[in-house]
């Protein structure tokens, strides 16, 4: 999600048929961007200098967020209590820095359409899923880890 709340990358890694469609994903990203901005204000947050919402826990999934210093937000929708999601988000940020930001043809704040970026993100997701495969038993999130990244 870019600084304006626009979706610049989305990939669904779940084999589950009951996932959000692209329109719902756009709405979720937009709402999250707004809530994240509101939560950073001192009038709302009980914590001084709050960095905003980092985790939303629901009864069926968790939504994690990592915001970079440049304002780009990486979000992962995962199975409840997934382990190592923060590590995955930081790895995706590294991939973003290496394969989007260093790409002379990539325009900041625009959708990322780089095949190598997508391949490396997939490798990061698979690596984290493999590392966590023993912690979960089936259901949602396709293997118990990240089901969507945006």
Placement of each model-derived feature along the sequence:
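Acidic, low-complexity cytosolic segments
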Residues: 3-150
